[in-house]
Curated annotation (Swiss-Prot):
The gene is citG. Signal peptide: none annotated. PANTHER family: 2-(5''-TRIPHOSPHORIBOSYL)-3'-DEPHOSPHOCOENZYME-A SYNTHASE, TRIPHOSPHORIBOSYL-DEPHOSPHO-COA SYNTHASE. Keywords: ATP-binding, Nucleotide-binding, Transferase. GO terms for molecular function: ATP binding; triphosphoribosyl-dephospho-CoA synthase activity. NCBIfam families: citrate_citG. Its EC number is 2.4.2.52. This is Probable 2-(5''-triphosphoribosyl)-3'-dephosphocoenzyme-A synthase.
């Protein structure tokens, strides 16, 4: 039974990756309509990447489940080692293009945490779609001890480093913690914002529209390192402001798609891509599938 459930959950993670890239239109991002602000990747590049990562999803679950009683730091190291192997498989499939490096990091953590949670909640092994809102929140919380050391390890002695990564510069200059911060805090954007928003939207509209609305909402709130890297703080804040206006409008699905398509043209012209938002959309969809919301 455990193997079947883990196979099913692994497929949900793959499904989340495929749903994200398929959702269209997504401003600045690769989708079924165009390549967004990317000239080195396409829809099929993302499909190849997702399929290359898929075999590792069950490995992440196994690590969390079978090592649940170990020190969280050791579990993290196991997940990181397998995550690096997955990353290498991704780069091999995409011929060196970084499609899913960031979200692979997060999926390793959240699938590992899902395995840990199942070790403590064996009744869930009988029904893969029986997860509740409380289960999702608990899984996010389990990431905290896994990543408690990350910020201190990665950002603790930046004043002593001669060369800084872009993420390190963002932290020093603006206090933006990026994916490390989101993980170390138990994915609050997903648990307390994205998932409640998506659940509510799905009660009043169809699945595609709800996902597009979630995309807009996330773009209006996320500290998107990809946007900042490409356009700077000012450009990121402008995108957030524009998306907040769109979020607060009451557009039909057709008008929403038209607005997103027009904004896609704008972001392409400025070479801006909200990749951080895309990653959080994937993770939100993963939990929505676990809860059988989608």
């Amino acid at each position: 039974m455990t193997k079947k459930v883990f196979d099913d959950i692994s497929r949900l993670a793959l499904k989340a990756l495929l749903y994200e890239v398929s959702l269209s239109p997504k401003p600045g991002l690769v989708d079924q309509l165009d390549n967004g602000a990317h000239d080195d990747m396409s829809f099929l590049t993302f499909v190849d990447s997702a399929l290359a990562l898929a075999p590792f999803f069950k490995i992440y679950l196994d690590i969390g489940f079978y090592h649940a009683k170990e020190d969280p730091g050791l579990i993290f190291e196991r997940l990181r080692a397998s995550g690096i192997e997955a990353e290498q498989a991704m780069f091999s499939a995409t011929k060196g293009v970084n499609t899913h490096k960031g979200v692979n990091f997060s999926l390793a953590l959240l699938l590992g945490a899902t395995g840990m949670y199942l070790a403590d909640q064996p009744q869930l092994l009988d029904h893969v779609t029986a997860f509740t809102e409380e289960d999702s929140l608990a899984i996010c919380q389990l990431v905290k001890p896994l990543t408690a050391h990350l910020l201190e390890t990665d950002f603790g002695s930046l004043d002593l480093k001669k060369e800084l990564t872009y993420g390190e510069k963002l932290f020093l200059d603006y206090g933006i913690k990026g994916p490390r911060g989101e993980a170390s805090e138990g994915y609050p954007t997903i648990a307390h914002k994205a998932l409640p928003f998506l659940r509510k939207s799905l009660r009043s509209t169809d699945q595609e529209t709800a996902q597009l609305q979630l995309l807009v909402y996330l773009m209006s709130i996320v500290e998107d390192g990809n946007l900042i890297h490409r356009g700077g703080i000012k450009a990121w804040r402008q995108v957030k402001q524009d998306m907040l206006l769109l979020h607060n409008s009451s557009l039909s699905t057709a008008d929403l798609k038209a607005a997103l398509s027009a904004y896609n043209d704008k972001l392409i012209q400025k070479n801006l891509s909200p990749g951080g938002t895309a990653d959080l959309l994937v993770l939100s969809l993963y939990f929505a599938f676990l809860e059988n919301q989608l």
